[in-house]
Amino acid sequence: MNGREVLTLRDGTSVTLRRVRARDAAALQRLVRRSSDRSVELRFFGPLKELSNEMAERFSTVDGKDRHALVAMDPEDPEEIVGVVRYERKVGADGAEYAALIEDRFQHRGIGIGLTKKLIEAARENGVRYLYALVLRDNAEMLGLLRSLDLPERLRWQDGAECVEIDLS
């Protein structure tokens, strides 16, 4: 995805999608602060009160090929991020790790699936053959999102979580 795109949510709200930028580090920190403890725990596999400056900089620095991330902007405050999806691929690997965080008030409205479909397009363009996500078993929302992609998937247990592998070929 180059530039910006508009995604219409299930309730008719329009949100802008775009690639993450280096200057988004502070907005990513605010997204984590606004998210519930449960949402943060499901994303980071444990409590996290604050996204460190180092983590925020890492998450907002992408190369568009092996590290790629897309964000959804708050329709009422276009400086604020309300959702982020990302993949990260090790050099030379066929697959990339996928992760997402959607602000609670925007969950179940279509941002997660909309961002993920755009991320999959970018992953395919960059030669990523599969995405994998480590998902806690009680994260029904993420498991449902991944299954709703209607792509071939494989499940296995890894490091205390479900590893959901989505085939992009």
Where are these regions (language model features)?
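Long, contiguous binding/interaction regions
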Residues: M1-S169
